[in-house]
C-alpha cells in the first residue's frame, strides 16, 4: 500500500514536470497568410499566401528551430509584415498565433515577435534571408 502511494506521488510529480516543460510554440496549418504594412501606418493589406506544403514545412522547421526569448518587447515602429498559419480544411486560423516581422535597419536581419506569447528573436543573417524569401518571395537585400 505504501509503495502505491509513493508510485502515485512520483508519477504525479513527473507529469507536472512534463506538462510544465512543454511550452513549445505549435505552428499548425497548411497555409501561411502574409500581410504587409501600408505606408508608415499601423494598417496592413494582404500581401502573399504560402500554400506549397514543402515551403510551409520549411517555414515551420525554421520557426521551431529558433531559440525564442521570453520577453515583452516594444518596437519603435509597427511591424513591416505580419503572418499566421491557417488550415485550409477548416477555413480558420489554426492556433491564433500572429508573427510580427521587422526588417533590421542594416536590412540583413529580421526580428520576430509573437506578442500573445511574449516571445522575441533577432535572427542571424542566414536564417533571416531564408525565412524572408519563403514568406515574401523576395530577397531580403532587395527590400
PLM feature spans:
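Function-determining sites in protein domains
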Residues: 3, 21-143
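Sec-dependent bacterial lipoprotein signal peptides
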Residues: 1-21
